[in-house]
A protein has these predicted regions:
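Short beta-strand segments
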Residues: 8-10, 81-83, 106-109, 143-147, ...
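ATP/nucleoside-binding phosphotransfer catalytic cores, i.e., glycine-rich phosphate-binding loops
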Residues: 241-320
Length: 320
């Protein structure tokens, strides 16, 4: 029996073409729909679910993808989602926090549009189909497949504006490799809390620490509509003292604050006890989010709030 793979196209560079001027534009006719499938034992059913450049993707689109996957789970052996690369890691992480069915779910994209020299779209697409049809991928969580590498949704991030090897996993490295004849996995996905959301809403912005930062940036936020805040802090998790004071005032208003490091590698942890240091921030109630970048920490907090987590339960989830 061939493996039946559901392909959900959502737009992005992989579906686009460069025009005569060299500008990459959206195409109404997705070139991936015309790719002949040379892979034996794989039956592809493709659907143009969205046709959006990935900067237009919102959590509501991510949730719609989750609901579609749940709806079709009994009809397929795996899922491939083609997606623009700018926010691909966020959609992958969002899906990875949902109660996804036990099947391979793979996101892929392209750094070069379909008619550019050296286009990587078709190769990445076929690689994703290979992984989605592999039974060993079913217990790895949501995966990102690009440039012969397999990455865990939780850790992967886009690291280069144009290079085809843009997707990397800082600190941990890739979860597996795609070889000519086989697929090699180095690691298994870790167990985690998953949610089954029907709706998602809320305002959780991200601010980044910088030298000379004061409390003015936080003062610009509309606190009456603020559901939470993510801070990209210095180093192991430190901010200027003026910023720390303002964060404490948010916490006193029961507005949760999550902290990550702005460093590319490493993990945020409370080390320094000076004013604005991580020790003081954690004592005040700031959540130290391990191993996630700011954009994923934002989704984590947004999902937790929509799931109704509060108090110690919210802290345990955010810091777990």
């Amino acid at each position: 029996m061939p493996k039946k793979i559901l392909v959900l196209h959502t737009g992005g560079t992989i579906s686009m073409q460069a025009d005569a001027s060299g500008a990459v534009v959206t195409s109404q006719d997705n070139p991936m729909n015309h790719v002949s499938n040379p892979l034996e034992g794989i039956e592809v059913h493709a659907l143009d679910f969205f046709n959006l450049p990935s900067p237009h993707i919102k959590p509501k689109h991510m949730l719609a993808l989750y609901h579609k996957i749940k709806e079709e789970a009994n009809n397929y052996d795996g899922v491939v989602i083609t997606h623009g690369t700018d926010t691909l890691e966020e959609t992958a992480y969002f899906l990875d926090t949902m109660e996804i069915p036990h099947m391979p779910i793979v996101l892929t994209g392209a750094m070069r549009s379909s008619n550019e020299l050296g286009s990587d779209g078709v190769y990445n697409y076929l690689s994703a189909l290979r992984v989605a049809s592999d039974d060993k991928a079913a217990d790895k969580g949501v995966l990102v497949v690009m440039n012969d590498e397999i990455h865990a949704a939780k850790y992967v991030t886009k690291t280069h504006t144009t290079n085809v090897g843009t997707f990397q996993t800082p600190t941990h490295g890739p979860l597996g490799l795609i070889m000519k004849q086989e697929i090699l996995y180095f690691k298994t996905a870790e167990p985690r809390v998953r949610f089954d959301l029907e709706h998602i809403q809320g305002l959780v912005p991200i601010i980044s620490a910088y030298a000379g930062m004061t409390d003015e940036l936080i003062d610009m936020l509309d606190l009456d509509h603020l559901d939470g805040l993510v801070v990209q802090a210095f180093g192991a998790g430190n901010v200027p003292k003026e910023t720390a004071q303002k964060l404490e005032s948010l916490l006193q208003k029961d507005i949760p604050v999550a902290l990550v490091s702005r460093c590319f590698n490493g993990i945020a942890e409370p080390v320094y006890a000076y004013q604005g240091g991580g020790v003081q921030l954690q004592r005040a109630g700031v959540f130290f989010v391990k191993e996630l970048n700011a954009q994923k920490a934002r989704l984590k907090l947004l999902i937790a709030l929509n799931a109704g987590l509060k108090g110690q339960e919210l802290r345990n989830y955010m810091e777990g």
